[in-house]
Amino acid sequence: MKFQELDGVKTLRDFPNSGIKRGDIGTVLASFTKPNEAYEVEFCSETGETKALFAILSKDLEILKINRRFIHP
């Protein structure tokens, strides 16, 4: 698996149906291996409300290059 639960990730492309854009930051909540490697990612607003929650293929995500504890205290 490329990512772990609670990893901070950013999107590598737009997801127009959900309002998520390339570069938006989310949190991995779960991982899947079938039929393809994918991750359930939650995207939150600045006030902490969930904006979107859906599965994304691993090729469309990148790990954040900052300390995990900074994102998930």
Specify the residue positions occupied by each region the protein language model found.
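Basic/aromatic-rich interaction segments and small domains that mediate binding to polyanionic partners
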Residues: 3-67, 71-72
